[in-house]
């Protein structure tokens, strides 16, 4: 792992692998770089110099006292600048929101990929009443499993059967380590407002990725986001949901890799 310092001095770690055009990967909630991208990095590194970062508070990265979206943007910007040239930037889940906003702050993003970031252009994000507060109570009680489980069922709308499978996998323990970061991200996500006017002249070529089996709200958000970003298109991943990096790595790499290499 390598590391750069963010603007507030926090070390942000990233795995660098492969050779070719630079590709920065930003993971979503409950994950770190390895949990999110372990199955696709070995394929992507054949074509790109991959920098897969651990967002603050996870993995080998540090954390800070004052969490905010701005801090997240500073972190991603630091990794982008470490490449020394324009990069391809990809974000998944909450990482897609971070990647999109970071792209407004630099001229060093060549292309952008966004996979189900929950970025809605017409309304604020609404979670089931009391969900975030219940997760905070779990966290205060030391019940990390309750935090992550509630996130999966109430926010991601994962079925109880799928959650049971996820809990049986070794990477569930890694997700539990990151449980403390989930409520704070949900507060940021809930307060975020997408202003279409800020993106009216946004010309970075953008791929908006959505799984065919993902909820209709994700498809609606993708359509609205594509309408708001002038140089964008939608890629629907057949038979997939929110985590094609795990469920169909080859399909994911083919779709994303072709876009960034074109």
Predicted regions and their residues:
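Short beta-to-alpha linker loops that shape the active-site pocket of alpha/beta-hydrolase fold enzymes
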Residues: 54-58, 118, 240
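Short beta-strand/loop motif that positions the catalytic acidic residue
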Residues: 202, 208-210
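Active-site loop/oxyanion-hole signature of alpha/beta-hydrolase fold enzymes
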Residues: 51-90, 254
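Conserved alpha/beta-hydrolase "acid-adjacent" motif
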Residues: 215-221
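Flexible "cap/lid" loop of the alpha/beta hydrolase fold
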Residues: 97-140
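Hydrophobic, aromatic-rich cap/lid helix
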Residues: 170-195
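Conserved HGGG/HGGXW glycine-rich cap/lid loop of the alpha/beta-hydrolase fold
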Residues: 5-62, 85
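Catalytic active-site module of serine/aspartate enzymes centered on a nucleophile-bearing elbow/loop
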Residues: 231-262
């Amino acid at each position: 792992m390598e590391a750069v310092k963010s603007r507030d001095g926090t070390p942000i770690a990233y795995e660098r692998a492969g050779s070719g055009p630079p590709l920065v990967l930003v993971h979503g909630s409950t994950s770190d770089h390895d949990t999110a991208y372990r199955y696709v990095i070995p394929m992507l590194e054949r074509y790109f110099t991959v920098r897969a970062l651990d967002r603050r508070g996870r993995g080998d990265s540090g954390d800070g006292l004052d969490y905010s979206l701005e801090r997240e943007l500073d972190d991603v910007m630091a990794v982008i600048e470490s490449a020394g040239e324009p990069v391809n930037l990809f974000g998944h889940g909450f990482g897609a929101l971070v990647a999109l906003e970071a792209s407004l702050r630099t001229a060093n993003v060549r292309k952008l990929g966004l996979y189900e970031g929950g970025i809605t252009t017409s309304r604020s994000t609404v979670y089931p009443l009391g969900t975030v507060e219940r997760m905070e109570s779990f966290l205060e009680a030391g019940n990390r499993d309750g935090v992550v489980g509630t996130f999966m069922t109430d926010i991601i709308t994962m079925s109880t059967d799928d959650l049971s499978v996820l809990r049986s996998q070794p990477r569930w323990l890694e997700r539990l380590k990151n449980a403390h970061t989930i409520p704070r991200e949900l507060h940021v996500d809930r307060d975020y407002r997408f202003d279409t006017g800020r993106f009216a002249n946004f010309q970075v070529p953008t791929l908006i990725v959505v799984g065919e089996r993902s909820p209709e709200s994700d498809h609606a958000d993708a359509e609205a986001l594509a309408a708001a970003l002038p140089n964008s298109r939608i890629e629907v991943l057949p038979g997939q949901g929110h985590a094609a990096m795990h469920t169909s790595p080859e399909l994911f790499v083919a779709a994303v890799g072709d876009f960034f290499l074109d």
